[in-house]
């Protein structure tokens, strides 16, 4: 199977850098799949789950919004955050979910509720990534 280099970069770090067989990303218009020899593309990404296929397996990351550029040579994904399943602590997620639900249920400030809703959405996404692939890990980036 053909392959293409993929890099996923956040403001803090390079979250992923490997040669892959395919990547599937969330966009405002739905999921987009990119294979080697894909036509050039530049698109905005939404918060969601990225599926990466390489080494005969699928791997998942939770990402924040950002952009993807596809060229003949490589795929570059620049996002606000990228979280591997092995970086997620389920107990912390459940606490964050409970805290967010408590804030949302109170008649507090709209701003606090908006932040809590975003936190709740991130918690659900990260929990999905964690449960989807609890026993798989992406290679470490040095």
What are the language-model segments listed below?
Residues 83-141:
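Acidic/glycine-rich phosphate/pyrophosphate-binding loops and surrounding catalytic core
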Residues 71-85, 89:
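Amphipathic, interface-forming alpha-helical segments with heptad-repeat character
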Residues 1-60:
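A positional/architectural concept
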Residues 7, 69, 112:
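Acidic-residue sensor for enzyme active/binding pockets
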Residues 58-59, 64, 71, 80:
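Long, amphipathic coiled-coil "stalk"/hairpin helices in large membrane-associated assemblies
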Residues 38, 48-50, 66-76:
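C-terminal interaction segments
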């Amino acid at each position: 199977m053909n392959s293409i280099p993929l890099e996923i970069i956040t403001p803090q770090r390079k979250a992923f850098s490997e040669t892959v067989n395919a990547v599937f990303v969330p966009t405002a218009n739905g999921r987009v799949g990119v294979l080697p020899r894909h036509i050039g593309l530049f698109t905005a990404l939404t918060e969601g789950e990225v599926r990466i296929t390489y080494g005969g397996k699928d791997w998942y990351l939770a990402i924040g919004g950002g952009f993807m550029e596809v060229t003949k040579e490589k795929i570059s994904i620049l996002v606000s955050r990228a979280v591997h399943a092995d970086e997620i602590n389920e107990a912390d997620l459940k606490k964050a979910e409970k805290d967010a639900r408590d804030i949302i249920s109170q008649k507090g400030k709209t701003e606090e509720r908006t932040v809590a809703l975003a936190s709740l959405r991130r918690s659900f996404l990260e929990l999905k990534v964690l449960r989807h692939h609890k026993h798989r890990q992406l290679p470490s980036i040095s």
